[in-house]
Amino acid sequence: MGPDTSKRRKASDFPQELLDLFHLYVHGEIDRRGFFSGARKFAVGGLTVAGLFEALQPNFAWAEQVPKDDARLKTERVTVPSPQGNGTVGGYLVRPANAAGKLPGILVVHENRGLNPYIEDVARRLGLLGYMAFAPDGTSTVGGYPGDEEKATALFRTVDSAKMTQDFFAAARWLKARPDCTGKIGAVGFCYGGGIVNKLAVELGPDLAAGVAFYGAQPTAPEDIAKIKAPLLLHYAALDAGITGRWPAYETALKAAGATATGYVYEGANHGFHNDTTPRYDEAAAKLAWQRTVDFFNKYVKG
């Protein structure tokens, strides 16, 4: 039995300007006070600014498509060496419980709030599809995900960004080198994690079998893009002007470099449309993007 989503609010329940304002808050471009100030004009008809703020917060129960204790999976917390990063990086490792032989690996990279329950569930979804999924927590060396999104965003900003990037590089290499891995790994990331997937494609070159980036920042230097050898699948939201607006130039650069890349822009969707814990979730776009992701990994990582 899946989560009860009967009371889920949809993006269409909110003015787009309010969703854009919340996007700025989530990404640290404005603080809570700034959000409240900008949201005042929407607090009408009995609505309060505090009520609007609360309605936009994630409900992690909605994201539990695969229970934490699902008997079909083996899960554990592991710590990986990261000598070029923060020394170590902790994470969540998921494997099929009845796996026989080596497994293809998928690195799952979180948004800008660390390893929250939504990303853990994504790892479990991949585990049920026959992958060994590893979801590192970029905030693990400063205490790890604190269980509160606002605190998580603040904690995330305390970690040196260059070292955190190296932590994900180390995690990918660790996953690829595991004796129970086939040596073929892919990576999927969301928001901040989408940007990391693009960076992984540059860093690992042919050692990455496939990369899938959901609304992730793109590299711009031609010498970096020339290093990309992995096939890329890139998902963008039409209403995410900043990130999606840079996709055409990235597409042109990838083609010039001879890279294999496919991008989709999902009409009417907001940044974060795959995250099924918030009102920005777009069910149709999320399901289509996820099926495309699964098919892509099955072709390039499992195949």
Model segments located where?
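N-terminal secretory signal peptides
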Residues: 1-34
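Short beta-strand/loop motif that positions the catalytic acidic residue
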Residues: 234-236
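Cap/lid segment of the alpha/beta-hydrolase catalytic domain
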Residues: 113, 139-162, 272-277
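Gly/Ser-rich "nucleophile elbow"/oxyanion-hole loop immediately N-terminal to the catalytic nucleophile
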Residues: 149-188, 302
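Short beta-strand element of the alpha/beta-hydrolase
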Residues: 102-111
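Primarily recognizes the serine-hydrolase "nucleophile elbow" in alpha/beta-hydrolase
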Residues: 169-229
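N-terminal cap/lid segment of alpha/beta-hydrolase-fold proteins
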Residues: 64-99
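N-terminal export signals
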Residues: 23, 32-58
